[in-house]
Amino acid sequence: MLLRFPTSYFEGMADMNTDREVIEGALALIEADGGWTQGAYYRDADGTQVHPAVDSPGHWVRVRTEHVGAGGYRTHTEPVAAPCSFCLGGALRAAAGYWHSGHPYAAQQQVDRLESLLLRQANSADAMNWPDLHAFNDDAHTTAADAVLLLKHAAAAYACER
């Protein structure tokens, strides 16, 4: 039996979105009314943080913690609709298919690279020097318009490469 291994890291990953597609996908998520949030990667319509369902790709859950007395707590999950608001990192992950991709490590590398690009743009456009994209996203002075503008600048940079 002859085994053939990929000749490059990205061979066979044709189902992955390009960097430009991920940026544009993240922009579409953030640009929607109420599509941007600070803090959590993903939030539902009630503003509660949601997580991808580990055992059911494409589905989302909300984690509930209940006090059961005498210092005890019980945690359970409940299914919810797809998230409707995203932080910048969450929007990139969603657009890259990070949580439901067949290639999570490649998607993570792509997200890391795009977060680095956005951070460089954010730091060059302002007097601030944020250590990471989360710090920019969660800064009290950052607005939804700032997040949209940052993604539009990145999309324009990729459009110029064509």
Go through each PLM region and give its residues:
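Domain-length accessory/inserted modules outside core catalytic folds
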Residues: 1-162
